Amino acid sequence: MNLPIFLALPLVYAIIVPKNHASTLVHRHPLHHRSSPSSWTSYGCWIDNTGARTLSAASYANTTGMTVESCISFCSSGSNSYVYAGVEYAQECYCGNFLASGASNVSMSECDMTCTGNASEFCGAGDRLNVYWNGTQPPSSPIIVRSAGNWTSLGCYNDSTTTRALANGMGVTGEVTVESCTTACQDAGYQYAGVEYADECSDCGMTLDNGSEPTPASSCDMTCAGNSSEYCGGPDHLNLYNYTGTLTTTGNAGSGTGTELLLTASLSGGWTYGGCYVDNANGRVLGDELDSDNMTVESCVAHCTADNFTIAGLEYSTQCFCGNELIDGAVKAPDSDCDMACGGNATEACGAGNRLSVYTSMGNITIIPVPTPLTSGLPGQWVYQGCLAEPAPGSHLLPYENDWTNNNTVEACLNQCAAFGYPAAGLEYGEQCFCGDISDVVDNNGTFVSDSECNMPCSGDPVHLCGANNLMSAYYWNGTMNAWHTPKNIGRYEFLIGGVVVPLIATVGINNKVTFLEKYPTSEFANSTGAYELDISLVDNYLLAWREMHVKSDVFCSGSIILPDKGARQINVGGWSLESTYGIRLYTPDGQPGVNGTNDWEENANELSLQRGRWYPTAMMMPNGSILVVGGETGSNGPPQPSLEILPKPPGGDTVITLDYLQRTDPNNLYPFLIVLPSGRFFIGYYNEARILDPVTFDTVTVLPNMPGAVNNFLAGRTYPMEGTAVLLPQHAPYTDPIEILICGGSTPGAAIALDNCISIIPEASNPTWTLERMPSKRVMPCMVTLPDGTYMILNGAHQGVAGFGLASDPNFSALLYDPSQPVGQRISILNSTIVARLYHSEATLLPDGRVLVSGSDPETNYPNGTAVYPEEFRIEVYIPPYLNQGFRQPEFTIAKTDWTLGGQYDIVVTLYQGTISTMRVSLIAASSSTHGNVMSGGRIIFPEFTCSGNTCTITAPPNAFVCPPGWHQLFVLDGPTPSHSAWVRIGGDPAQLGNWPDYPDFTTPGI
């Protein structure tokens, strides 16, 4: 099967990143101003379009500095004194005293583009205008001037940019009014005069040409630029006047000046005249318009030079356009066609109606042909579909939008969508690239229209078309882009037992019981101790299944691992606030299934503590047997703690090392991912970055490429609070293959749209790159569990939000299975679903019998009346993976020696019930603790070498502490796909002699 190629792609707009933590999220969104300079206030979001402006008086554009304030200033100062100001498309400003008839108000959410000069303000959108009002009543409604001297109104007539009703454009000194235009036509000796598009004395003539006919007066709805109480035509419509007096001259002079116009042959900066060109035959041949009643060749060239353009064009006496090439198949016209005098210098030619006087600083002028849809030579398996109409203004068929103002191309858009696993792509408004699924088009009632309606060139490729306003050039992937399997055997969820605690940390001990820690003392129950142990063998007897334990300080958002000492102690570090952030807590599992233990958590902050207070730290067992603790903050929503430290702390020494990259990326790097690599170096993943560290100095050895995020937001993150989950993919004897790391889920800043992809990397490859695989659904706060057969279950989490209280919604009830033995793009199977929402503070843990324990959910999301949207979840479930759902009897084995040295050989005696020794496998899964989606062993699984004679098999332990850091492992035997119950083995001993630490009388040390 053909699979998508993963490419490096253009970056998209940066998005304001909110600072968010477990209990708060401060959203920093752009603002719709409710109050503005002086008495101006917001008047709402209004529909606008290029054919009939809602505000049709003065206007200007600023591609880099537009703000609400600057637009209001423009509309209320100098010769402008308007009661309405409007900002549109991030960079355009419009003024007027009237809202055009038929203009309609829409939801403020549709005005969603930020201003080019202030990203904290909204400046409308495509065909959407943020309107502001100064509080004063507008002047009287404009009128159609019935007569001006001997000129009499004939009404509103249709016109066209290609077939003019009147043949001769006319230059007018100053801003256009009915009186100034009729005077100019009379002075030039013409019978008819027409005013159009507010500021154009566009036509004078002796006859009415090209079949121009009367139209309704409402079509001439634009007020004159020089007098807002008069109407001066509209788009492609003119107010026509007839001279009833006696003409003293016969009309024949296009400029009306009576003098020959000069072509400026030499300008500063190497600018030269390039000729007269036809405009609007197929569309505007230049963009970046500037209008000025005092326009000159020199001022237009200066404007274009300041904006780094190489071509300047002047039209209609007062219009200046800039660009670097002429587009839409521009063709030359006779120089005599450019016969209108400049508004600011009557001796210079400034084009004419649909004629541009063109100047260039490069000598040559590049002509870009009329753009067409790109239908051949497409990347991958993309196929052009046609022009798709959006369902309604402001809504979109495809969900993910990129805005590439200057560099949108069909190829870039298709590659971006394919790289993130989306088989439908659409290009719109020249600069927008949308990605999604073909089903999105169907579900949103997408309708194909004529290809001719998608007529806007791509911002980065003017030769090809990229849709139009509310129209997209659509492309589909021809083939299967994401092969998500739907097997018949999908396993199932089962209710296990009601809980006494809403856990935030779950750990399976070597006594085969599960310890739970909660955010003490914030339990649902006043008498909760914050710590309990569950005996899985007694779940049918609720009163016997739970054992009460105790912690002395608040473990909320701490980190846990299993020590390699003889007792397999569980160590928990960090906490919620104050003294608890320094906490070090130890528990030695005891008892056995069906028999209560007596040990409890041990803690004494006066004797044993971290060197720095930490909330949301990660802990990792190093190859030398010491404990690495990294990151966090100084307390709940406190300043960053961007450092690492080593436990046990040597006498008199401080092991803290500051990490500048954690300082820089706070608060989006909490619970960083830590994994020991086969080289002995350490992988650290935080926010959307990753690097490899030296195991002795902790200096950076390699900065890895940034992690891919969302298709439309490269600022998406993978660690808390934009929380994903990470594991190490399987290692197989003889351990020569490079190791691979898998990270799934996460979220985006701002809107907090969860990610629907997994990414993987071989960090120690010669040229490491991330490979992206799309998941069937979005997921933030997921959990990932390593299974004995080398597959991984992905479950829990939400479709939207980030980690923290009340910050996520729309639970993801479905479970997935990731199988790294399959080809990339074909590794995910869709499993069963639950009815229990598992959001913030949920866990998933492998049990010794091969089932997955699913617990927790502490979202604290409430309705306005205070009732919970999602409950504090006490119910504990198990998931029966497909390998146990077949009904096969699990294999069995016995083992004599469970304390293994690296590279040693150890015997087991196996009993298989389905297969034979030839199909048997053996796996070792490192002991771990689950919290916030972080498996602090990295979910390490090893398939060691073994040989068998009869039913006695000899396993060779992993060769070194880089492949297998010291610690306890669950040993499984697999009969085909079916795992046995596990046995605990310790591999690599206790090289740092943690079993003798800490040496205080109130701590129990199990020995090494």
Language model: regions and residue ranges:
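Beta-propeller blade signature
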Residues: 529-538, 582-594, 640-652, 690-692, ...
